[in-house]
Amino acid sequence: MAQVAVTTQPTDEPSDGRMVVTFLMSALESMCKELAKSKAEVACIAVYETDVYVVGTERGCAFVNARQDLQKDFAQHCQGEGLPEEKPLCLGNGEACPGEAQLLRRAVQDHFCLCYRKALGTTAMVPVPYEQMLQDEAAVVVRGLPEGLAFQHPDNYSLATLKWILENKAGISFAVKRPFLGAESQLGGLGMVTDAGRPTVPPNDSYGPVSVKTEPMEDSGTSPRAAAMLIKTESEDPNYNVCNVQGSQHFSASSDVTGMELPSEESTRMVALETNEDPETEVKMEGNASPSNLVNSAAGVEDLRIIQVTVADNEKERLSGLEKIKQLREQVNDLFSRKFGEAIGVDFPVKVPYRKITFNPGCVVIDGMPPGVVFKAPGYLEISSMRRILDAADFIKFTVIRPLPGLELSNVGKRKIDQEGRVFQEKWERAYFFVEVQNIPTCLICKQSVSVSKEYNLRRHYQTNHSRHYDQYSGQAREEKLRELKRGLRKYLLGASEIVCPEQPFPNASPPTNSAVQPAEEVAGSLWEKLRQKIRSFVAYSIAIDEITDINDTTQLAIFIRGVDDNFDVSEELLDTVPMTGAKSGNEIFLRVEKSLKKFSIDWSKLVSVASTGTPAMMDANSGLVTKLRARAASCCKGADLKSVRCIIHPEWLCAQKLRMGHVMDVVVDSVNWICSRGLNHGDFTTLLYELDSQYGSLLYHTALKWLGRGLVLRRFFESLEEIDSFMSSRGKPVPQLSSRDWILDLAFLVDMTTHLNTLDASLQGHSQIVTQMYDFIRAFLAKLCLWETHLARNNLAHFPTLKSVSRSESDGLNYIPKIVELKAEFQRRLSDFKSCESELTLFSSPFSTTIDSVREELQMEVIDLQCNTVLRTKYDKVGVPDFYKHLWSSYPKYRSHCARMLSMFSSTHICEQLFSILKLSKKEAQWGAALQVAT
């Protein structure tokens, strides 16, 4: 602590002023000795006539009259408090000077604010609504004013009345009978600014218990009277806090603090001070504080009171209080986020645009807020208000009346969690009994999962549901409980796998009673390790790749592997699921696939084919995924020929554009949805169909996004066509197309065509289909298209029964020949992938009937031996393909290798769609991701 030297005094001050400074510096030097151990910053302030003198230390350096902010703040304090023993300055005519009148009015106004605050029952200063109180005198009753004196603004009172009010202010009080709207919006601040622009703080706000002791000045023989002191406590943080202490209980933020935005840490501390959850602050006044001991020290020098303030540096208590406030604020913010998310139609919290809601009233309406609490950001709410909001959480509701300017609500719900970069921390396992399973935090106690790896989400779940029973575990006991819960999680996950896929339980799963159960965190690892072992046994494998956008608007890339081992056992397994962010180019997809294959140490030379969706990113000749995979496989194995199979699992999707029947589907979709989306209309239509004894009791709700159900929808619509036309006409929504003969013919043709396509689709969706079987189905459908083209040319409608039932002309069938031709051409293009390897497929499916000339030269000798072997021919006729190849002797190594390669090929990406269905089920039932590998 630096000592203050006399040489630092200003030389241009008058003698009385220098005497005051000398006295202050002497007092400062003695206080520096006392406060040296506490490392406090000290300042002494005194008022002499119209001047303010400040001396003190800051960062070990002394200053005199250098702190203009302290002078200004102290002067405002003196004006607000008033000097009772100071004689008012008067003008020559005996009237009070304007400064005194302004001082009295401000004092009365502050007292009225205090009374109004007490009447509202809040700790924050609230401006008195003078105009509203004068207009509605019954709303707020003012007690304690003399008879005949009406309540009005202090500016309208005379000086005598102002003095009387200040002398009798103890008996004046307000009683709120009917609160004014809008008064609550000013609650919750640290302070307020009056009409004069003077910052004030509620007088009852304090820094904790205060003890005062007076110290007489021995060198002057006086006991100073009017003073204040600024102290600073230094901690490890270089940014120390500044608190201006005025009197024993009155505080005011200095002008330099109120004029700028506080840092987050300092702002938090100010809130802690306001709520009395702060570290204890002790103020001591050396000496006797009674007024009888206060004497004048020198001529013209006002009495000076020296105050010593000690701030208890209890770091643990301070952090505990701040943590409670932080948690409370997080809980309120999370509540508002969840309610706002519900208002815009999403099932997860959405960041609330507080400023836009505040500055655009009427766009978003918040109902259910507690009485007296106005919606605002949690950082501006009082502690008591936040607690009341949490108590009323069930009643709070957000309603979006109209869009907020500059905010696209349709994009608010598109949350990309994978881009937030959140990482599960190991310490959360012990703190909240959570573990991470397939990148999803899962509670070990109740097995519920949390969508985002955020500590607040985990802590809230634990404190809300489990803390009452599990806080009793600590130290070693908590570690034991954690291990026990992990063992229990494995049992739960094994059960989950049976739910998802009961016919394929976990391999080598131990019974629940086995005491040597593998820890839960190793379950997923053991499954992937077994997959690695299985992949190493493959002699040939293929991959299937597909992508889909999930409910979080994140593109998921699914990679499946189908492999064959030496015993011709076929395995289809989920290799990896990779979220795709950013560009979805062929190069980006290739890098993800290459990384997944590298993770399992897969041999590129054994890769046979890749099945994909046929998009440009997959099939582009220059930078597509298939092109890059072929180059990668060729670099690992000279002469490797990677085959590509485009998805043909949904031929009805291919035909949607080729048939060009949108004018029919649009009418059907609009009509069906209009009937089904209205409960009353739907019920009336059901009754109508029942009365008419129709075949169907209701219609299938349909959207234009999927063709899979169009056959059923169209057939039901066609067979109820007359009833639908009558019903919609009676409801004032006639559809002229329902009476058009040409439109009805198109509808009938579309019914028959979609029925044929759905039959093909059902055949293609079989589980573990061999590529030759899929090829046979497509070739058969192509042959049917050729037959239908020939029949329609002769107006033979034998295979179009619906069209035949409404046909009245011999040329009706001719109109649909172009549609059959386009459909046939599209299927031929899709079959080109299989045409390139048709001879190899034929050798695999019909080894005893294929011609030797169509077989590759390196296989011809073995195929001749095979065709002449009657034992193997008998076995082939008995078991067929593919079981026959399990009995194929090892004396045919090249042919066995060829058959293994054909058997490993995917014919479509249907297995990927099975995965996406399980993923949706997993999100609803809170199952974990590792079970997907078993299910597929």
Swiss-Prot record:
GO MF annotation list: DNA binding
Coiled-coil positions: none
TM ranges: none
Major subcellular site: nucleus
Gene it is expressed from: Gtf2ird2
Protein's name in the database: General transcription factor II-I repeat domain-containing protein 2
Keyword Zinc-finger among UniProt keywords: no
Protein location: Nucleus
GO cellular component terms, semicolon-separated: nucleus
Pfam family, one: zf-C2H2_12
